Structure formats: C-alpha cells, structure tokens
Regions:
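Short loop/turn hinge sites at secondary-structure boundaries
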Residues: 65, 179-182
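Nucleotide/pyrophosphate-binding catalytic subdomain
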Residues: 1-165, 171-172
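Conserved small/polar residues in nucleotide/adenosyl-binding loops
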Residues: 183-189
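Structured C-terminal cap/extension of enzyme domains
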Residues: 169-178, 185
Length: 189
C-alpha cells in the first residue's frame, strides 16, 4: 500500500522510536545509569491536568535515579500541534521541571558574531538579557532537524527569561556535556 506523508511519518516514527530508545538504553547502561522513556505531545502541555501528570511522572523517575528520555510522540502527534523541534520541547521540559540549566546541542559552537564559515568570526561568549541577535543568527538548518539556530535562540531567550541558564554547545565535541556542566566549555551562555 502506498502511504501518504502522515502515514509515512507515523510508520517511520513508530519503528525509529523503538530503535532510538534501545540505543539510549544501551549507552546509559554502559555507565550503570537507568533510563525510562517519556513520549509526549504538545497537547500534554495544554491542560493543567496533563501538564502536572507529565511533570509528576518525570519527578518520580528522577527521585528514583531514572533519567527520563523525553521525545515527541510523532506516531500520534497532529502536524498542526507538533513541537517546532526538539529544542522547543527541551525548553518546555526545562521550564516544567524548573531546571537550573538547559544545554542545547548543535553542530556549531554557539552563536557567532557573523557567519561561522567567515574567517575571524567568533562565538559570542555570553548574551546579555534583551540583546538583539537577529544580525548574527544564520537561518540555515542542518539536514537533520526541523529547527536551526533561529529556533535555538528563540527557545534559549524564553527559557533564560525564566531564570534558567542556557548553554548552546557543539554536540560533536568530545566530553562537551561534562565541559558544560563544569563551565569550562568555550560555549556561550
């Protein structure tokens, strides 16, 4: 049977989600860290009851030493109500869980004061509250996601306005999460 685009997305999501969570399970297991899967939709943030239920689920997991692996439930998400991308989802989760920090990984080192490919361009180390970054944000997206740096900075600003530290870092660098947690990373805040 020939599938339409929605059916294709649902099929690929259902198959891919199983592979993805198994991969996370194996990676974390190597370090003795238990993980659990939380599939969500944008609608889960729409009512207080669903919001609190989701928050409580993740709190119980964390209190019991289980790391929640949160992902959009693409198999049932309605296109019009989907998250922009995982950056939006991570920002909403960081706010929901009242986190101290949100680390957004990218394929570049952060926000640059020009095009990252231009010689002499540098990463902006720290963004001041309310600073206009529109001249610096590249609108291209990588071939892997729906968002891009524009979405990352939009989400980062919203989350930072709530008092949560936001770091945009290059996820391709070895030990970047440890570096970010130790604040030794060259990534901007």
């Amino acid at each position: 049977k020939k599938l339409d685009s929605v059916e294709q997305r649902q099929l690929f999501s259902a198959v891919g989600q199983a592979k993805l969570i198994n991969r996370y399970y194996e990676l974390f297991r190597e370090h003795g860290i238990p993980v659990g899967q939380v599939l969500t939709t944008k609608e889960s943030f729409g009512t207080r009851r669903h919001y609190l239920n989701q928050r409580n689920c993740m709190m119980v997991m964390l209190e019991n030493g289980v790391i929640p692996i949160v992902n959009e439930n693409d198999t049932i998400s309605v296109t019009e109500l989907m998250f922009t991308d995982n950056d939006e989802l991570s920002g909403m989760i960081a706010s929901m869980m009242d986190m101290q920090a949100l680390i957004i990984l990218s394929n570049i080192d952060g926000i640059y004061n020009g095009s990252p490919s231009t010689p002499g361009t540098q990463v902006i180390r720290e963004v001041e509250q309310g600073k206009d970054l529109s001249d610096y944000i590249q609108t291209e997206k990588s071939g892997f996601g729906r968002g891009g740096m524009l979405t990352k900075t939009t989400i980062a600003r919203k989350v930072a306005d709530e008092g949560i530290t936001v770091i945009i870092a290059n996820g391709k660098k070895d030990h970047i999460l440890v570096d970010c947690l130790l604040y030794t990373s060259p990534s901007p805040r």
